[in-house]
Amino acid sequence: MSSADDQTTTTSSELRADIRRLGDLLGETLVRQEGPELLDLVEKVRRLTREDGEAAAELLRGTELETAAKLVRAFSTYFHLANVTEQVHRGRELRTKRAAEGGLLARTADRLKDADPEHLRATVKNLNVRPVFTAHPTEAARRSVLNKLRRIAALLETPVIEADRRRYDTRLAENIDLVWQTDELRVVRPEPADEARNAIYYLDELHAGAVGDVLEDLTAELERVGVQLPDDTRPLTFGTWIGGDRDGNPNVTPEVTWDVLILQHEHGINDALELIDELRGFLSNSIRYTGATEELLTSLGTDLERLPEISPRYKRLNAEEPYRLKATCIRQKLENTKQRLAKGTAHQPGRDYLGTGELLHDLKLIQTSLREHRGGLFADGRMDRTIRTLAAFGLQLATMDVREHADAHHYALGQLFDRLGEESWRYADMPRDYRGKLLAKELRSRRPLAPSPAPLDAAGAKTLGVFHTVKRALAVFGPEVIESYIISMCQGADDVFAAAVLAREAGLLDLHAGWAKIGIVPLLETTDELKAADTILEDMLSDPSYRRLVALRGDVQEVMLGYSDSSKFGGITTSQWEIHRAQRRLRDVAHRYGVRLRLFHGRGGTVGRGGGPSHDAILAQPWGTLEGEIKVTEQGEVISDKYLVPSLARENLELTVAATLQASALHTAPRQSDEALARWDAAMDVVSDAAHSAYRRLVEDPDLPTYFLASTPVDQLADLHLGSRPSRRPGSGVSLDGLRAIPWVFGWTQSRQIVPGWFGVGSGLKALREAGLDTVLDEMHEQWHFFRNFLSNVEMTLAKTDLRIARHYVDTLVPDHLKHVFATIEAEHELTVREVLRITGGEKLLDTHPVLQQTFAIRDAYLDPISYLQVALLKRQRDAAAADTPPDPLLARALLLTVNGVAAGLRNTG
């Protein structure tokens, strides 16, 4: 199967050669597995698509279903192979750049020489970057396919001499054969435990290599510029929503949460055991030649008394090797911890570990003793790497966030308050301000609100039960296992206080006794809440009881910003602008109350859901909003794109850590004058208002819901079994309001319209230009990181959008009376392209990124046939449904294969 690269020239001849090599091997697989006729048809379709799209569409329209399915699979497999090859070469290019210019952390450290030394030390002390893995249904590729692609990546990454090429090509061909013979469609919808295994797959790999490399380099580069990374600082940790995100997912029960935590710990402890076994191999230091601290020897004696499992023979063999013997005791405690969790027995101090802190304490005894007995090189090298890696993952691998909808808390509390009968209002009828005061008063109270068990119906008991599960988890697994409780659709301080009251009822906090085991996190996810962000935080922190809770959590308040829903309801321009402004306002309120703000960015994979290059996005944050800490969601196909190839995993983690460090240490004051910032803010208000109006006109068109369903395959999303979470909110019917942001983006992306990633931007920019502010636009693009980053992401999405293909969807699938919606989309697209090019100065989109521009052009030769087939199959399916013909399983299967194929070709689903 030849490559479309043959028709082009790119800057990377090696990349072209590798894609051609895999394309040829795929062609051999097709002949070997299906016969030469399939390969001939693939080449004919690809050639015809390039020469005459309509002729290609006509040919595919009459293709038999079985052949159509094979065609789609051939093109999709090509994309999987091309994607993994590009990932390998991206990693290779980054390594070449590292060799020539030094690593990104080294370059960042050089910039830090200009930072205020005291502020830099404080930033480094607080440094914590936390990618949070979520299970949102956007990863279309099955793990079975991803495993094989990872093996292909490993083969491509290995330098091969000519004498070995035949053997490596055989290994590649074997894996391509296996990909072809693997069903890429899920037979059943995954359970949360299956989703957890997917995330754990990547976390295990990161544990084994990339994270240790990043932390070791970070420590060394900071030391080079005179900054010590404190021993107790965790610059990199990981989070997860899998098993903890209950909002709209009835499959996440307290029992499921527990099962996922057990699964994470099984892997986390096994990963820790591998590192400890490695240490035992190194730590042969004899007490005859080195000595050891009294503290280490005392702890070793205590361990040996408490751990009779360690055989006398082993004690005798290692009697003069206290470091190795201590590592053996650590290993036994880890084994005991694993057994305790499996059996559900109680923690035995000194025999097993309750949380990561006890493990790290034991390891630091070894490290300190080595430092004091001429073992500093190993103590500050391999030993430090091991300790920091274990601190990054903990025994839990990733700290779980728990999330629930604000209404669920109020529903439970309504039953408890109404039962008391002390208020003149029914709880559900209370105005928000009144309810907030009632809950704040209750938070101050010493008495419990309800007896135990609380008199609640099934739904209320389930909500309170989650808090009890969190309490139990902290008691069994340790304090790092769950740290944040997130309230989705948070609209006011009362929503935060409600969760805090339920946490108190479950024994998770006691303001009078002075402890709080979890933090409460508001999630602001619509435009209205983003605009009110400062008011909401002010109302929270001005209440003495809640301020006390924050103090007990280290004077840190986490706030999550939702990109997906704000974009769906307000359009991308208003969403991005209001999130940017909300961060400024939140920063000012937090500073006023002496609180450190931790922002949690709920980004999706696509630009329409807040996606885009992480490094640029972090550097574009407002000044002072990063104080060394950031949390960012990693969703769906973004996880495999960033972490499937080990070299890329390292670079992506390095990018995020470096950007956070740089922005926190150096961006402590405005880069612009107050006058310039005021001018740009006013300009962005004009852009946002006009863009919002254009977007709302589109989504409020009464014909849009029917048009959206007609012109996209969004109804097929549920059949793909991408995730455990339903694509619609409960009881939402067929309205767009009830459709989650992910399928909203999914549908537009599949039909190549990608409306959420750009619609309204042209109207906004035009409004500013017509106001005579062309020069301000140019100034913003040249000098304002936020605006330049925003426009760059929009330009990339416009380049992925293909209204020529979209028109084929509309002409074939959409009734005539709805086609005016597409006319609106076409007009706004033309306007947006024109306005963006006026600012960038290019003749075509991505003129400043010729390699990316060419990559998109190359992919179209393979992507367009899949889109043509998708349209033809959708037409067949809908015609059959209209004629009451029984569903054809082969037709449904072929259609779902096209959905996977487009996702692979665009490297995005939702």
From Swiss-Prot:
GO biological process: carbon fixation; oxaloacetate metabolic process; tricarboxylic acid cycle
Enzyme class per UniProt: lyase
GO MF terms, alphabetically ordered: magnesium ion binding; phosphoenolpyruvate carboxylase activity
Keywords, comma-separated and alphabetical: Carbon dioxide fixation, Lyase, Magnesium
One Gene Ontology cellular component: cytosol
Gene3D superfamilies: Phosphoenolpyruvate/pyruvate domain (1.20.1440.90)
Database matches in PROSITE patterns: PEPCASE_1 (PS00781), PEPCASE_2 (PS00393)
Keyword Lyase: yes
Cleaved signal peptide residues: none
Active site: 136, 568
Reactions listed under catalytic activity: oxaloacetate + phosphate = phosphoenolpyruvate + hydrogencarbonate
E.C. code: 4.1.1.31
Cofactor(s) needed by this chain: Mg(2+)
Cited NCBIfam families: PRK00009.1
Similarity comment: Belongs to the PEPCase type 1 family.
Role according to the record: Forms oxaloacetate, a four-carbon dicarboxylic acid source for the tricarboxylic acid cycle.
Protein name according to UniProt: Phosphoenolpyruvate carboxylase
Species whose genome carries this gene: Streptomyces avermitilis (strain ATCC 31267 / DSM 46492 / JCM 5070 / NBRC 14893 / NCIMB 12804 / NRRL 8165 / MA-4680)
Biological classification of the source: Bacteria, Bacillati, Actinomycetota, Actinomycetes, Kitasatosporales
